[in-house]
Amino acid sequence: MAKIIGIDLGTTNSCVAVMEGSTPKVIENAEGARTTPSIVAFTEDGERLVGQPAKRQSVTNPERTFFAVKRLIGRRYDDPTVEKDKHLVPYSIVRADNGDAWVEADGKKYSPSQISAFVLQKMKETAESFLGEKVEKAVITVPAYFNDAQRQATKDAGRIAGLEVLRIINEPTAAALAYGLDKKSAGTIAVYDLGGGTFDVSVLEIGDGVFEVKSTNGDTFLGGEDFDMRLVTYLADEFKKEQGIDLRNDKLALQRLKEAAEKAKIELSSATQTEINLPFITADATGPKHLTLKLTRAKFEALVDDLIQRTVEPCRLALKDAGLTAGQIDEVVLVGGMTRMPKVQEVVKQFFGKEPHKGVNPDEVVAIGAAVQAGVLQGDVKDVLLLDVTPLSLGIETLGGVFTRLIDRNTTIPTKKSQTFSTAEDGQTAVTIRVFQGEREMAADNKMLGQFDLMGIPPAPRGVPQVEVTFDIDANGIVQVSAKDKGTGKEQQIRIQASGGLNDADIEKMVKDAEAHAAEDKKRRALVEAKNHAEALVHSTEKAVAEHGDKVGAVEKGAIEAALADLKSTLEGDDVEAITAKTNTLAQASLKLGEAMYAAQQPGAEGAAKPADDVVDAEFTEVDDDKKKSA
């Protein structure tokens, strides 16, 4: 049975793990790293780079390098949070035909699901290379506070990458699974997850293999990227004060600032001061300009203090929803790279009144939890039951634009709930069901997930027809809504397709694009391998001709030199078959030279050392020490 893998699709980094028997294992990628940057880039000639290779060239190719795209997934272009990000990233965020936020490079638009799919493909290949078999099924994690549109978009990304997503699991829940798998004692834990782009806090009760989420809260636009951007803004402001040049208008400089900010942030977790040194960051009429600045940990903490404080309110709400006090939490588990920051740990300690647990790897624990859930689905992991919750209330718009809740936040999923509504006007023959997700009292202030019409209601006075609306949330947190006229039995149901989002045709096209890209990547790899093999042969043959060319006849030497010249000129092109054919020709032609070189090394060959006259051929037998003594 093919393995089901667990993938942590992160804002900054992604990670893949698999169960080996009853033990989860994080898989190293082709570069030998256990996490892969969630970065996708396109080179000038259209080659696609994913992970570390994409990150390495980001400074010289900022407009075609996409990072932190998870923050855009399932979001509308006119979302205020997208508006804020547009001016802080060097790549273009554009409006898609359906009103969603997409990204663009060289005139080609990509949906965030598509970019995420390229990262997922890399994780899939990493797992396949380790397992030695095809991988087609996965469990993928999402921030607990993701809404339906964001969950659906993540599932779409999996489909585009050629993966059947068996389960979407919340990141803090996955972390709790990994943390609690080998724990024997029962208890209540809080998972504080501050990652690259999102913040979640979940309260869980663990005991006897049951992981029950009591509540969850968070902010899907708060994470390490915001800390980086705060530092980028500070550096740009300081440079402008000193030099009068705004580096934010220069995409190349902006990318260098971003890289320096990330590096400084990481260094300040262990050091109390760091130096940011960016020579030749820009130039004006007076010549090149350099940015040099000392940054203390205290200054950095002051710059981002409000961001850290923003995590406190979700923690308070999560405890309130769970009906618990901070003192009733047995353990606080830190997840996400940003929890390495001493100030973050200090704030967590102050709020919960206890030292946070640092025994899990914050970068890998979510992928490990996803692998455990994959093991549960596969039947490899027994006696584990996961009870998650829906993060946001779900309901419909009723008369006067009021948001009427059908399912409250933190309801255990899967769940199903029905409620009966009626018409607002006399003789009304159709109703429009508008579905929303959120916590505000007016529907317009919440996130609209979609709408559909129930037609063919028999005309009747207002308030008489009875329309039963049913919400069904599956274990992935994805919503299905149906409406039924009780009088006629007519029913209309939809799996929520956000007013934006990708339809099946879009996804199918993107799947084909991804397959085409995979085919192109294979061709490129074949070309690189053919060229490497050819160049190695050219080098070794030239060396052999220089050292041993006199050992073959003029005809053979001429044939080798002709084949060499032929292969060298073919190497200037990109025809794999031609390069392979010419490589074989050269290999064949240089066989005679190899034979001559080998013959020259043999005893009796010309130039080989002759044995001395007094050397006698003899047979040797082993004699043990006792016989030696008696001899």
Curated annotation (Swiss-Prot):
Keyword set, alphabetical order: ATP-binding, Chaperone, Nucleotide-binding, Phosphoprotein, Stress response
**Where is composition skewed (Acidic residues) in this entry?**
614-624
* Gene name tied to this protein: dnaK
Protein induction: By stress conditions e.g. heat shock.
Q: Where is this region: Disordered?
A: 601-631
Where does the source fall among the domains of life?
Bacteria
Q: Which cysteines are joined by disulfide bonds?
A: none
The name under which this protein is listed is Chaperone protein DnaK
Question: Looking at the keywords, is Chaperone present?
Answer: yes
Q: Which InterPro entries match?
A: ATPase_NBD (IPR043129), Chaperone_DnaK (IPR012725), Heat_shock_70_CS (IPR018181), HSP70_C_sf (IPR029048), HSP70_peptide-bd_sf (IPR029047), Hsp_70_fam (IPR013126)
Q: Which residues carry this modification: Phosphothreonine?
A: 198
Q: Which Pfam families match?
A: HSP70 (PF00012)
Q: Which GO terms describe its molecular function?
A: ATP binding; ATP-dependent protein folding chaperone; unfolded protein binding
Establish whether keyword Chaperone is in the entry.
Answer: yes
The similarity comment for this entry is: Belongs to the heat shock protein 70 family.
Q: What does this protein do?
A: Acts as a chaperone.
